[in-house]
Amino acid sequence: MGEPLGLLQVTVIQGKKLVIRDFKSSDPYVIVKLGNESAKTKVINNCLNPVWNEELNFTLKDPAAVLALEVFDKDRFKADDKMGHASLSLQPLISVARLRHVVRVSSGETTLRKVLPDPENCVSRESTISCIDGEVVQSVWLRLCAVESGEIELKIKLIDPPGTNK
């Protein structure tokens, strides 16, 4: 776990069918964690289907890393309410990044792997991992756990560390 495997660029795109935690709605935000790093989106007031389109950056060091996210409802006078959590193994993304170097995919868009929903993961819809003009990108919807409903859409891009030959 010494040298970085790359920069992980996580775009929190949107949420769908989030749970109500205030009187009629919620004020959601997302905290994304990778190892001991964490980052937070802005709060979207009074919305159960928020659109963030926020890019959060992390240093990927562990090939067995798991991306974790928690969704909260911002409250003014008391502790923020939990609106669910989800996690995503980054092993498929990392293996595709390694494969890309072996098969020398560099231009255009090529789907190299699919991740299917199953009881062992939080993936809610079929997810694709593609090589787009030399960059490895995963588009994924995650089902929120420990709540009645809710999904979060992410776009995850693994960027090679500086000095790496593509």
Curated annotation (Swiss-Prot):
InterPro entries: C2_dom, C2_domain_sf, CAR1-11. Its main location: membrane. One of its GO terms (molecular function) is GTPase activator activity. The modification N-acetylmethionine is found at residue 1. This is Protein C2-DOMAIN ABA-RELATED 11. Binds to PYR/PYL/RCAR abscisic acid intracellular receptors in an ABA-independent manner, both at the plasma membrane and in the nucleus. SUPFAM superfamilies: C2 domain (Calcium/lipid-binding domain, CaLB) (SSF49562). Keywords: Abscisic acid signaling pathway, Acetylation, Calcium, Cell membrane, GTPase activation, Lipid-binding, Membrane, Metal-binding, Nucleus. The modification N-acetylglycine is found at residue 2. CDD domains: C2_ArfGAP. GO terms for cellular component: nucleus; plant-type vacuole; plasma membrane; plastid. The keyword Cell membrane applies. Gene3D superfamilies: C2 domain. It holds the Pfam family C2. Ca(2+) 2 binds at residues 22, 27, 73-75.
